[in-house]
């Protein structure tokens, strides 16, 4: 009876919190207890929110997302995995300790192993997967770190397949790296399908059926389509989650939140606040339309092909706003301009491109000259007037000389005929 009352209290606490969070102002930063967090747009790879995203943290059972990814990439759902004796030594939560006793040598389908791993978070099943996929646990750890490197998780080092860190300080990752991992698992249909389940019926080949429930309390709430919880004393409460609303998909990660036992709501409140902020966040203008983002220095002949040379600085501009989500990350903006002919310059013709980048996000924009060929002509108008006057004088003098020569010739002929 007490458990039912506690469960109802937790449920209504979460519902109240999530409903209140939904109406929070879109332009206010989310309030979270977690010491490290991120929101990433999985379509564009833009970082919508960041808090200490490169700070190394213990990920606890979120580690199992990498274990799940390697299982999905190396086994089929119907493949059988053998339960090793060493798996019995893994700490709770373990299927063999907390759900139903398992005898070494018993087998699980890869499908049931995936369900137990991601829903129940079975530590012994993670060990079983490691030995069956890698041959040994150590070889599997090597596979985990190689995969992390391939995904661009440059601040990650795995030591265990389940995230237990009692005996090591070398098992770590970052919120940013876990967002990259979430992107990879979201792309895997098997894992994506598994994380959406609220519960699953599983069994070993020699054991009875058992129901394992999803420890992600947010599944199915306000667009939550999956996630992985985690907790150790070193890591604090952790949660990585996937959200989808109106076809828009976000990844959220919270590390180092509080485990407010027995209700255990804080990390879920943190995640809900992140999701609501992420779907309502507005970008801010980083560089405004028609603003100068750089300049190009070049030399040209004041009169095409001839005449003295002149050096000019050409402003490089954009014809649209460059907008980014407001975060504590520093954007980079680089421009690249092609070969320029000053006599064909137009403010409406692209002369190259600019690339704005924030961590793994990049977007290109066309760039334009801030001046046209007419501006160059106007800047040299006095020279052209002077040159024209000189030309007129020269032509006049030439014509005058020619006229004198012709007059002398006519006078000479007239004397001869007299």
Can you name each region flagged by the protein language model?
Residues 6, 12-15, 19-21, 44, ...:
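Generic "edge-of-domain/loop-turn" microfeature
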Residues 17-18, 78-79, 137, 203-204:
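A short hydrophobic/aromatic micro-motif that marks alpha-helical segments and, especially, helix-coil
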Residues 24-189:
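Active-site-adjacent loops and short helices of periplasmic peptidoglycan-processing enzymes
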Residues 153-157, 169-391, 396-416:
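Domain-terminus/edge residues, biased toward the C-terminal soluble/receptor-binding domains
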């Amino acid at each position: 009876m007490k458990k039912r009352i506690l469960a109802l209290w937790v449920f209504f606490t979460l519902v109240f919190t999530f409903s209140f969070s939904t109406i929070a102002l879109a332009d206010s930063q989310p309030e979270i207890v977690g010491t490290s967090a991120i929101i990433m747009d999985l379509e564009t790879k833009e970082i919508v929110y960041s808090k200490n995203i490169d700070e190394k943290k213990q990920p606890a059972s979120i580690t199992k997302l990498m274990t799940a990814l390697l299982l999905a990439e190396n086994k089929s759902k119907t493949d059988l995995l053998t339960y090793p004796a060493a798996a019995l030594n893994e700490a709770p939560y373990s299927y063999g300790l907390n759900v139903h006793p398992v005898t070494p040598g018993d087998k699980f389908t890869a499908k049931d192993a995936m369900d137990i791993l991601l829903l129940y978070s079975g530590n012994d099943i993670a060990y079983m997967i490691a030995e069956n996929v890698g041959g040994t646990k150590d070889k599997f750890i090597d596979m985990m770190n190689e995969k992390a490197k391939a995904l661009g998780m440059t601040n990650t080092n795995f030591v265990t397949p389940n995230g237990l860190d009692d005996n090591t300080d070398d098992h770590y990752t970052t919120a940013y790296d876990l967002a990259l991992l979430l992107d990879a698992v979201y792309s895997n249909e098997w894992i994506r399908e598994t994380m959406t389940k609220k519960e699953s019926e599983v069994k070993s080949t020699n054991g009875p059926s058992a129901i394992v429930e999803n420890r992600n309390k947010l599944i199915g709430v306000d667009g939550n389509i999956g996630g992985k919880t985690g907790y150790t004393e070193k890591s604090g409460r952790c949660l990585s989650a996937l959200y989808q609303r109106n076809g828009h998909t976000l990844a959220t990660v919270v590390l180092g939140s509080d485990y407010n036992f027995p209700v255990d709501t804080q990390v879920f409140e943190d995640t809900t606040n992140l999701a609501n902020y992420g779907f309502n966040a507005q970008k801010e203008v980083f560089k405004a339309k028609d603003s100068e983002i750089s300049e190009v220095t070049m030399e040209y002949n004041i009169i095409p092909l001839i005449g003295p040379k002149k050096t000019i600085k050409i402003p490089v501009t954009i014809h649209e706003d460059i907008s980014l989500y407001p975060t504590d990350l520093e954007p980079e903006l680089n421009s690249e301009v092609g070969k320029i002919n000053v006599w064909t310059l137009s403010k409406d013709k692209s002369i190259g491109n600019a690339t704005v980048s924030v961590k793994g996000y990049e977007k290109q924009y066309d760039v334009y000259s801030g001046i046209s060929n007419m501006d160059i002509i106007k800047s040299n108008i006095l020279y052209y007037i002077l040159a024209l006057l000189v030309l007129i004088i020269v032509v006049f003098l030439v014509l005058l000389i020619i006229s004198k020569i012709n007059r002398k010739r006519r006078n000479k002929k007239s004397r001869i005929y007299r």
